[in-house]
Amino acid sequence: MYNKVILIGRLVAKPELNKTLTDKQVVRFTLAVNRRFKTTGEREVDFINAVAWGGLAETLASYASKGSLLSLDGELRTRKYDKAGQTHFATEVLCHSFQLLESRAQRAIRENNAANDLIDLALEEEKLPF
């Protein structure tokens, strides 16, 4: 039997590096992945939770940011945990490797465009009569 996941998508938020009680580095993050098909003229998006450990977690937290385009290679995992006396199950991708798919220059352009969009939105709101 074989369990392999390959995803290409954008990070929903900047990955934050954390440490476990046993001092292991971990990053939990969400990847926005477009579906192949369109139902209403626009692609639907799946938000897939993933986790990276150790040096891989440190590298991801250091070099990736919100909106970064990356490919991820890993395996699907399920886990069970208890929260307030209730048993919960989670499914996530355990990341074995990743690759950033945009250069620093491309990332700077994307971030600059996002900042300009926010400025334009603020200017439009100033024109509102109320």
Give the predicted meaning of each segment:
Residues 1-2, 22, 40-43, 86, ...:
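Acidic, gly/ser/pro-rich intrinsically disordered tails
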Residues 4, 28-30, 49, 59, ...:
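Residue-level recognition of specific faces of alpha-helices
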Residues 4-45, 89:
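Core FKBP-type peptidyl-prolyl cis-trans isomerase
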Residues 12, 16-18, 53, 77-79, ...:
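Conserved positions in beta-strands of structured domains
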Residues 53-88:
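Beta-rich strand-turn-strand
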Residues 80-92, 96-104:
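C-terminal structural segments of small proteins and small subunits
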